[in-house]
Amino acid sequence: MTDVCHGYLIGKGLLRWGRQILTEVTVGIETAPRAMSIEARTIRKLRIRILPFVFLLFVVALLDRTNIGFAALTMNKELAITSRQFGLIFGIFFFGYFLFEIPSNLLLHKIGARIWIARILITWGAVAALTGFVHTVHQLYVVRFLLGLAEAGYFPGILLYLTYWFPQREQARAFALLVTANPVTTILGAPVSGLILDHVHWLGVSSWRWLLILEGAPAVIGGVLTYFLLPSRPQEAKFLTADEKEWIRAELGREEQHKLEQRRYSTLKALASGRVWHLVLIYFGMMISLYALTSWGPQLVKSLSGPYTNSMVGLLLAIPNLMALTVMIFVSRSSDRMLERRYHVAIPAIMAGTALVLLGTTRSPFYSVALLSFLAVGIYSFLGPFWALPSEFLTGFSAAAGIALINSVGNLGGFAGPYTIGAIATRTGNIYAALAITGVLSFISATLVLLLPRKARAPKG
């Protein structure tokens, strides 16, 4: 009964906080005054018509990355999965993701976002549902690898897609709204996943299987909606007037010309660019931290919270992500307003590293959730300003290739982090030493960010 009361109080607080955040997110999307410049009118329409749709699609995308962490609470025992094996199960997804990432993004740029994003959603939704039918660890390895192949290109594809619509000075905020899907997915998905694990045993089938099957369906639905609703380019958007389409074309054209005047990047030059690989290294270190949180977070909280149910674990994990959602919106707005990226990327990385190092110093559920909150704030606040960096010097096919390279190679941290933590946990019996090591990597990422060259402000046109 106490657990139910705790859950009710936490849930009530999360809802109240969520309403406040929703108000903050929608600032700037309110009813426009009668007299509004074409720029303000166009950006407002894009924020209303493009961002919410791609945001919801990305929430769907992230369910398969968070639900495996929750499924592990009961799946690992049923399939006799060790910590090392679970790290490999989580991480092997990123090998498939890595192999097809760059070709997928180039195909999106060539074929069009509507068709290609719909294809990605439908295929990965089907494969995600298949995960619930595995019976051995090796079958799980295969399906997770196939899931990575199916999903490859989705996140960098959406980032590339947003660069077709938003000028550079608006991109950090647009990217940040997209990556708020990370904490929002956990805020919504963690309690739901916990409830499914505790209560859904239909037809005598294990609850973790239903969790994986049910959370694959939204991707298929999202793929169908994408095919019919998502315009590939501004010229196809029925909600824009002719002068608004022309404003976007002219504004993005000016920015592209400015980049070309500074330096021309072909696709191959982008893939070989030292500046692109500099961003790859930064992202790799931070992805180790991100997937340490998403893969091991449920098991870490469960081990500290004793008799709490899976539903309660889900509610506790929602707290760090709700705090992160609040702060990352502020950080991205500050980055766009100041047109500054380096410190808006480096400081959150330092916060994440500090939290990871300190996690091993306490066994208190309260302080652990507080440190996980600090970690989530650091990781997610990093993402919006970071993803505004590649578009400062890449355009067209070079942007498609460069963004995909950064995301695909950087996301191999999603393999390295969970697998290393699992291997150390299997050998030592705890994960805290491994978490401290990942914290050091976040500090290295922060240092690399500060070594990036300063950029002249983009022209406003």
Predicted regions mapped to residue ranges:
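Extracytoplasmic gate region of multi-pass secondary transporters
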Residues: G69, G274-L325
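Glycine-rich segments within core transmembrane alpha-helices of 12-TM secondary carriers
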Residues: A176-S193, A219, V409-A416
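C-terminal transmembrane helical hairpin of 12-TM major facilitator-type secondary transporters
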Residues: R341-F386
